[in-house]
Every structure is written in C-alpha cells, then in structure tokens.
UniProtKB/Swiss-Prot annotation:
Belongs to the SpoVG family. It comes from the Bacteria. Keywords: Cell cycle, Cell division, Septation. Gene3D superfamilies: Stage V sporulation protein G. Signal peptide: none annotated. InterPro entries: SpoVG, SpoVG_sf. Could be involved in septation. This is Putative septation protein SpoVG. PANTHER family: SEPTATION PROTEIN SPOVG-RELATED (PTHR38429:SF1). HAMAP family: SpoVG (MF_00819). It holds the Pfam family SpoVG. NCBIfam families: PRK13259.1 (NF009749). One of its GO terms (biological process) is sporulation resulting in formation of a cellular spore.
C-alpha cells in the first residue's frame, strides 16, 4: 500500500497543531483529519481521532506496522516542507476586523 496523494493546509495558530492533512492510499482510499503536531521532539503526524466519554483520545484509523507509519510520516512531511501558504485559524481573534 502506497500514499499516492497528500492534501495539506498549514494552519496559523498559537497551539501545537500546524497543519490539517488528507491522504490517499493506492489512489483508492482517503483518510481525512490527520494533523501535523509540534511535539517536544519536533513535528510529527497524528492520526485522526475522537474523544471517548472518559476524555481519552482514540485513533479512528491508523497504520498497523511501522513501515506504513513511516511512509505516511515521510509523505506528509515532504508536502509540509514544500508548502508555503499558511491559512489563519478560524478560531483566532482578528484585531483588524472592520466589525463594530
């Protein structure tokens, strides 16, 4: 199985999330809502997850071996490094808003 497409949007935020990502596997299966996160040891790709009733986060989809995890990490980070455009976070306050 190969990563055949990566769609990435860098996000401008004060938080640790740096980008939202969708990947396509074998030109046949798409996984949305991966995230590039700034961790203590640098950037890494987090799999899509949801919060459980007890407050824990649980992956919705994830690779089951280290080779596939590394392929996803490499493909996403290559596109991340090549992407210059940063989209402002919708939740960030805008100081230059014209609304009164």
């Amino acid at each position: 199985m190969k990563v055949t497409d990566v769609r990435l949007r860098k996000i401008q935020t004060d938080g640790r999330m740096k980008a939202l990502v969708s990947i396509t596997l074998d030109e046949a299966f798409v996984i949305h809502d991966l995230r590039v996160i700034e961790g203590n040891s640098g950037l890494f790709v987090a799999m899509p997850s949801k919060r459980t009733p007890d407050g824990e986060f649980r992956d919705i989809a994830h690779p089951i071996n280290s080779d596939m995890r590394q392929e996803i990490q490499d493909a996403v980070m290559k596109v991340y490094d090549e992407t210059d455009e940063v989209i402002p976070d919708k939740n960030a306050s805008s100081e230059d808003s014209d609304e009164a």
